[in-house]
Amino acid sequence: MVLRALEDGLEFIDCINTPCEGGEECKARRVWNKIYKSMNLVLDSLTLDDLLHDQKRYIYLDHSATTAVDEEVLSKMLPYFYEKAGNASSQHGMGRDAEVAVDRARKQVADAIGAKSNEIYFTSGGSESDNWALKGIAHAYKSKGKHLITSEFEHPAVLNTMKQLEAEGFEVSYLHTNPQGYVSADELESIIRPDTILVSVMYANNEIGTIQPIEELAKVAHAHGAFFHTDAVQAVGNVHIDVKAQGIDLLSMSAHKFYGPKGIGCLYIKSGVRPERLIAGGEQERNQRAGTTNTPGVVGMGFAIEKAVNNMDENNAYIAALRDEFVKEVKERIPDIRYNGGEKRLAGNAHFTFRYIEGESILFTLDLAGICASSGSACSSGSLEASKTVLAIGVPAEEAHGSIRFTFGRENTMDDVKYTVDELEKTVKRLRSMSPLFAESTAKITMI
């Protein structure tokens, strides 16, 4: 496929190469064909000038993918890039200063989730923490059993790690979700076994935002002698968490989800729980996680989580008001949609399925209008497959590709809501006017 610029607009033209070897389309060509179909729906009204002179302010509605570093947090980090740049493992003065800063951040993180400082282990982020929790428990406790339980709509960091463990000979059972996006403690009770050593269920879903019954699930796991892990990457800083009261044995988090820096996270490991270490090397993190300590990142994470927790109720009330107004307006103004997920969800999350059109086309058009949203998990947004989460809650496969996630943050405004709804309404109308599926459905209604 070739994108050709013309005086009056843009168009896709097919390449002149002979068919792929064997007569079948190669993977690259299949990708381009999908892009071609989606983009052709919007390029008819787009000119090259639109792209070259687009200077719109971005309206960022993808806070579940990442957040900007808070200015105050950044100011706390900066000294540790230069004048306080010592290695926290060094014994000289600059090293000791760095160690003090790391210890302070460790306490800030621990206090935020009701843990003890010696239960916090810094990592590179959520994916490493998930890998360490799952592989570490599986390998350390396999003599007690080789059965693991998770849910069918976890983050890829959990699902793909479980696949690796299955390849090693572990058995994995998957909890289902109901149409509202919640797993059931009753189902967990029905599938847990004497040889189950770990249950892992995410705290809040990264796509539809539903908050799971963590305390109930942990009670079931413990009643049968299993550990309980939760991927709380989306929840930390947005939901009040008390690992002791909720019975959590291991918890993963990542700073960039609560206005901290990227590349830093941690794994909470309850005292007495001993997963096998994931990364071999030096003796950092009390000899449990090798690698030079990312002091600026750790410092930023500590201050970010402290600020997020201290202002959580106020921020959530503000963000939920934006989200609720957005949802109300979309439901009133755009027909043939599905609002995904139940009421107990993250304050900023709104997830819709728009029937008869592709999510990629919606996102492309919104992007041109300066609106940043997402078709689902940022860690799997390059996949051409429909979202596993959306399929798991019962959205038909033919509709699932039309799903969009909007996630609001504390810098958004009601003006952002109004502008986004206006642009979304125009976008959906125009794309449906060119959709054969929409035309077919309209014709059927007319015949009836």
Regions found by a protein language model. Give the residues of each.
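Non-DNA-binding regulatory cores of transcription-related proteins
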Residues: 1-56
